[in-house]
């Protein structure tokens, strides 16, 4: 166990919560101490969902450990069923409750509830959030399809399942809209989308489809592998993030249906023309460091290298389960993959690589800010600003447009700030210079010599910290204040005294 102020993934029961929250009619009873109810805030405050997650906590306290906590759990299960009337229930223990070994699955089964009760064994001290989400989806799918025969799919239109979109997912809602629209243009019907919006009964219909689209391998990979083994379904693993990846995805779907890709499929794409223009040469060769979950890190590396012309200075992930895939991707760009969930190791790697742009998670945003490097967030975990109310996908052709803006704007704005800094002291463009298109007014005769005020170097340096568009006013007000109070040498204290004076 490691004591840290930041973790890229929560414990596996958070992953289970993400699956239960994404679905409808499924309730999660979690054997957990009182403090573990913090997880609700991830959905209501960070993702800004309009309802609490469907989770009942036993919320045992320290004084309960000397009594029968098993009875406490059974009462919580019974009360949750009576109150919420779920269609299916999953039960498990949080990382803390795992230590008291109450066997939530066995206790819930002993109650004999008239609904499916799926026990989860999530080793909190060996695994993490995405693994917990994948394991939960797998167990739900396995329970729902138990006893379902392999259907005869001959003579029917091609249909697919979309697996992976979940609650608290990075742009999952918007990605799903884009992929659904793309499949419609390719003439493919959607059988089931899971877990987002699905009911437990819907999972039993999954085998009826011809193939499973694994939109997010970290979440859906385990379930898709099981479905391929048991029902012989094809698995589409191309993640349509980026222009080229979306083209590959469309070609894979067209091959499944035996059709051709429509000529107007890319009518939404608006980024490729710029990559071919002379203006884009400013971006060519810029060094970029990429870190995130495996799917997004691999996809963004391909976009950065092949669609914009960046040089990959570093590539890594915190998803240890996908270390092999990330290492293979890193080899394509002649860099060594960074596989770590320690943010200090990531910070050291970024500092050593000296990139001009960082693409990462919320933590890489903080790291890049400390190092003075432009940054864009491209992967979970993220904060509230990366769960926008607007439509902002990463998948599909519209997602390629969003990604192009996401990757290029930090460098474009960085150039603007660099130019402002470069010419700040120029004789013609400095803050005190009058606009060049205006004539200079003749100086009015001065009847009495004003008090001459000077500036300490430290005060001049402090003044430059003020944004340039109000710096002139700040200088004028400070000098006026100094003249009125007989101050001949302006210090840092004078600046703040003047600010307080004119703020009244």
Swiss-Prot record:
EC category name: oxidoreductase
One example GO MF annotation: ATP binding
A matching Pfam family: PCP_red
EC number per UniProt: 1.3.7.7
Binding site for [4Fe-4S] cluster: 36
Metabolic or biological pathway: Porphyrin-containing compound metabolism; bacteriochlorophyll biosynthesis (light-independent)
Keywords assigned by UniProt, alphabetized: 4Fe-4S, ATP-binding, Bacteriochlorophyll biosynthesis, Chlorophyll biosynthesis, Iron, Iron-sulfur, Metal-binding, Nucleotide-binding, Oxidoreductase, Photosynthesis
Comment on bound cofactor: Binds 1 [4Fe-4S] cluster per heterodimer. The cluster is bound at the heterodimer interface by residues from both subunits.
Known catalytic reactions: chlorophyllide a + oxidized 2[4Fe-4S]-[ferredoxin] + 2 ADP + 2 phosphate = protochlorophyllide a + reduced 2[4Fe-4S]-[ferredoxin] + 2 ATP + 2 H2O
Binding-site positions, substrate: 414-415
Gene3D superfamilies in alphabetical order: 1.20.89.20, Nitrogenase molybdenum iron protein domain, Proto-chlorophyllide reductase 57 kD subunit B
InterPro entries: ChlB/BchB/BchZ, LI-POR_suB-like_C, Nase/OxRdtase_comp1, P-CP_red_C, Protochl_reductB, Protochlorophyllide_Rdtase
Active-site residues, Swiss-Prot/TrEMBL: 279
SUPFAM superfamilies: Helical backbone' metal receptor
GO process annotations (BP): light-independent bacteriochlorophyll biosynthetic process; photosynthesis, dark reaction
Function comment: Component of the dark-operative protochlorophyllide reductase (DPOR) that uses Mg-ATP and reduced ferredoxin to reduce ring D of protochlorophyllide (Pchlide) to form chlorophyllide a (Chlide). This reaction is light-independent. The NB-protein (BchN-BchB) is the catalytic component of the complex.
Family assignment from sequence similarity: Belongs to the ChlB/BchB/BchZ family.
Quaternary context: Protochlorophyllide reductase is composed of three subunits; BchL, BchN and BchB. Forms a heterotetramer of two BchB and two BchN subunits.
Listed name of the protein: Light-independent protochlorophyllide reductase subunit B
Lineage, broadest ranks: Bacteria, Pseudomonadati, Pseudomonadota, Alphaproteobacteria, Acetobacterales
Encoding gene, per UniProt annotation: bchB
